[in-house]
């Protein structure tokens, strides 16, 4: 993926508007221009450019515009090369944003390509502050990245967040309508018993949510589809026992 991003960056030309806002920013050297494209519920592809015209192209789990305050929104033309690259990965682009941010950007990055000295400086700043955003990519092996890409194309409804992978479970067909609320409460109990966190401020409506940390997801024998299926099978057995007693 890094090699593909490097090639994409070479054929991507974008105007840097930072100098136009120099008089409006308290310290322009602490700011970056960001151009981002994404599909809902999928990773973001964003280009960042500083005042020295250093450039980094990044694939991140979340949208910088969702996690950080954008100081100024700006108009920008999206290069066709970026759109073409993204649609090959995730089928379509349904959101484009451009703006000026103050560094650091606190989004977990899967891969970066571009000015290595700038990237290493960002790495060092995160290490000093005990943060893991751009540094996150160092924990994401090629195998783990491929595993994540396959998950995004699976039948599961998931959203990648900084804190982990949120899974949105649908109401099962086997539950009676009058028991849906009861089953939900049972699911909450089972989730707590298994030490699973719920999604925080979920972006989607769902019968029940599960949050899986990246450490767990990156385990070699961990399978998210099996994990979700096993959870629902346990919940079904609990439900059948309870209903038989009514």
Swiss-Prot record:
Pfam families documented for this protein: DUF4895
Domain of life: Bacteria
Protein name: Uncharacterized protein TM_0928
């Amino acid at each position: 993926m890094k090699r593909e991003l490097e090639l994409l960056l070479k054929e991507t030309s974008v105007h840097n508007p930072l100098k136009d806002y120099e008089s409006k920013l308290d310290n322009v050297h602490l700011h970056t221009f960001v151009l981002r494209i994404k599909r809902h519920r999928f990773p973001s592809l964003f280009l960042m450019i500083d005042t020295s015209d250093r450039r980094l192209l990044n694939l991140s789990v979340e949208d910088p515009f969702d996690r950080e305050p954008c100081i100024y929104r700006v108009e920008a033309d999206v290069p066709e090369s970026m759109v073409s690259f993204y649609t090959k990965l995730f089928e379509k682009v349904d959101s484009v944003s451009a703006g000026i941010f103050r560094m650091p950007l606190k989004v977990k990055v899967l891969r970066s390509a571009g000015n290595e000295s700038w990237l290493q400086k960002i790495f060092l700043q995160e290490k000093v502050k005990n943060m893991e955003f751009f540094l996150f990519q160092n924990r994401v092996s090629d195998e783990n990245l491929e595993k994540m890409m396959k998950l995004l194309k699976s039948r599961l409804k998931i959203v990648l967040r900084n804190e982990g992978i949120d899974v949105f479970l649908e109401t099962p067909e086997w539950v009676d309508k009058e028991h849906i609320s009861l089953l939900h409460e049972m699911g909450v109990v089972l989730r707590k018993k298994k030490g699973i966190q719920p999604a925080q401020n979920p972006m989607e409506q769902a019968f029940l949510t599960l949050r899986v940390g990246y450490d767990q997801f990156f385990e070699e024998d961990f399978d998210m589809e099996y994990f979700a299926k096993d959870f629902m099978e346990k919940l079904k057995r609990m439900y059948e026992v309870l209903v038989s007693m009514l």
